[in-house]
Amino acid sequence: MSYLRKAISSLLKVPDTPERTAFGFAIGVLIGFSPFLGLHTVMGVAVAFLFRLNKIAVMLGVWSNVPWLVIPFYSFATWVGVKVIGLPEGIHLPSIEFSDLFRTEFWIWLGSQWQLLLPAFIGSLLLSVILAAIAYPTALWVVKKYKSAV
């Protein structure tokens, strides 16, 4: 069984109301796509316990930001942040090709661009709220559909 099927199966079998399950999942998505890289799991566990949310649903939401989404998501989030608050003074964004990701020069350049942290933070915060707002009704619909069929 694939990872995605196992995750969906776990979410659907959570012994809770569809609303609480969907809310927990949406909060997990909010945390999982937040700008706090490296803290997502700890934050998910803490929030689930602190607010007595469904822990399985929260963690599945947190882990929906899988490793292969990190670079595309946070790149897009930085772009969104730049569109919202503007490009910091003195920063010039070059055209980047996919093949550049495999060049040492690109990573050296990227490491010197710490001024992009604020746009990345703002962009990922905005996108995580949007994704959570989409996740709640979607998860609610799926869980209700499953529970009515069982």
Residue map of PLM features:
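Transmembrane alpha-helical segments in integral membrane proteins
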Residues: 119-144
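Residue-level signature of transmembrane alpha-helical entry/exit and packing/kink sites
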Residues: 20-24, 58, 116, 120
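Membrane-interfacial helix-loop-helix junctions in multi-pass membrane proteins
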Residues: 102-118
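Small-residue-enriched transmembrane helix starts and helix-helix packing motifs
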Residues: 7-30
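Juxtamembrane non-transmembrane "cap" segments at the membrane-aqueous interface
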Residues: 75-103
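Short, Lys/Arg-rich, polar N-terminal cytosolic tail immediately upstream
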Residues: 1-12, 150
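Transmembrane helix boundary and interhelical junction motifs in multipass membrane proteins
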Residues: 34-47, 51-77
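Membrane-interfacial segments
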Residues: 84-89, 138-150
